[in-house]
Amino acid sequence: MNRDALLRLEKLVFEFYWKRKNLATPFMTGVMGVLIGLKPTTLQVNDEFDGKKLLDNEIIPKILDELGLVLAKGRLRRAQMAKYEYLYVGKTKELCEDLQGWYEKFSNSISDEGKILDRRVWIEANNQIGELLGYPKTATAEYIRRQVEGLDMDDNYMMRLGRNNYYIHSEKFEEEEFRGYDLLLNLAIKEYLPKTAEIMQSNTEKRWLE
């Protein structure tokens, strides 16, 4: 692990999000997840604040390259989502292109109001995206089931959503998902990304190492 490059990246990302430092954590945790082999890719947005975009700082892509990561970027064709420039980061160009392709298919399978238009494509796209992002299969499966069946967000669901990071954990396998994904990522963040760890630990409503 190139600790020096990681710290330089963290510094630049937090400088960009200086007004709302908590917004820096998704980028850094996504990159860390790819670096430790927990997830094949990460999906981010080229955010814009005060007229400047994250990747206007040309040093950031150079550091990602230094870390052995590939960066792809692009916009979706659907008007509702075209205003965002999406960033696809992974260890190979092929993985980034896979994520980009499946995210395009996902966006085309829903309406502007979020209604599923093509159930088969929507389900396949979510399964593929979940796998490319390294999410536990049990969590992806429950998310798909709840959406397809139109289940309400009950108290149990909202409590799981409130205490966990990264993705929506399933009801039955929440603990296994946490220990197989969240905990491993959080331990790496604690070791390599001090600013990110500080911000994440400050949110006492979210699980950290237990």
Segments (PLM) and residue ranges:
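Glycine- and acidic-residue-rich phosphate-binding/metal-coordinating active-site segment common to enzymes
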Residues: 121
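A conserved ligand/cofactor-binding region detector
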Residues: 1-117, 125-128, 135-210
